[in-house]
Amino acid sequence: MSYKLDVKAQYIKDLSFENPNSPQIFVMMSKATPEINISVNVSSISLPVKTDDQKSGTENLSSLYEVTLQVNAEARIQNTVAFICEIKYCGVFSIKSDAENNEIDLSHQEVKDMLLVAAPSILFPFVRELIARATSSSGFPPLMLDIVDFRTMYENQLKQGVGQNDNDNSVDNV
């Protein structure tokens, strides 16, 4: 049996762009290349929703999950902040089965894998484009984030013993 993530919605939950040292920073940029630090965090929460089964007339508890991809980028030139960009981009997902009854028979670890690896991989291109647009609209060259390997990020945290608590549905990469 195979499973897939079904995207129900995606949206910007929080977006902040600060350009605290303009216009001086643009003069500094003409003489030096900024140092850019980026951090990435993925988290998920369960959103239980009651649904009516039209065929049997019964109520079922169907789980939706909100996955948040948070990216923080800070650029500095000679210890002066050029810009700070912070975004929390979310998606609401459900897990679908190819079985006729759509019964989900996944372990907790398999669900975490889908939510912390597959889901952020779906969200990342949108975050990347939003950050590039925000930086270029603020007078800087567009910041094109490198592709993030969410599988490796997740596996590294498992090796370090982080996120092994059943209630911890997050992954960090700094």
From Swiss-Prot:
<keyword id="KW-0811">Translocation</keyword>
<keyword id="KW-0813">Transport</keyword>
<dbReference type="GO" id="GO:0005737">
    <property type="term" value="C:cytoplasm"/>
</dbReference>
<dbReference type="GO" id="GO:0051262">
    <property type="term" value="P:protein tetramerization"/>
</dbReference>
<dbReference type="Pfam" id="PF02556">
    <property type="entry name" value="SecB"/>
</dbReference>
<dbReference type="InterPro" id="IPR035958">
    <property type="entry name" value="SecB-like_sf"/>
</dbReference>
<keyword id="KW-0653">Protein transport</keyword>
<protein>
    <recommendedName>
        <fullName>Protein-export protein SecB</fullName>
    </recommendedName>
</protein>
<dbReference type="GO" id="GO:0006457">
    <property type="term" value="P:protein folding"/>
</dbReference>
<comment type="similarity">
    <text>Belongs to the SecB family.</text>
</comment>
<dbReference type="GO" id="GO:0051082">
    <property type="term" value="F:unfolded protein binding"/>
</dbReference>
<comment type="function">
    <text>One of the proteins required for the normal export of preproteins out of the cell cytoplasm. It is a molecular chaperone that binds to a subset of precursor proteins, maintaining them in a translocation-competent state. It also specifically binds to its receptor SecA.</text>
</comment>
<dbReference type="GO" id="GO:0015031">
    <property type="term" value="P:protein transport"/>
</dbReference>
<keyword id="KW-0963">Cytoplasm</keyword>
<dbReference type="InterPro" id="IPR003708">
    <property type="entry name" value="SecB"/>
</dbReference>
<comment type="subunit">
    <text>Homotetramer, a dimer of dimers. One homotetramer interacts with 1 SecA dimer.</text>
</comment>
<keyword id="KW-0143">Chaperone</keyword>
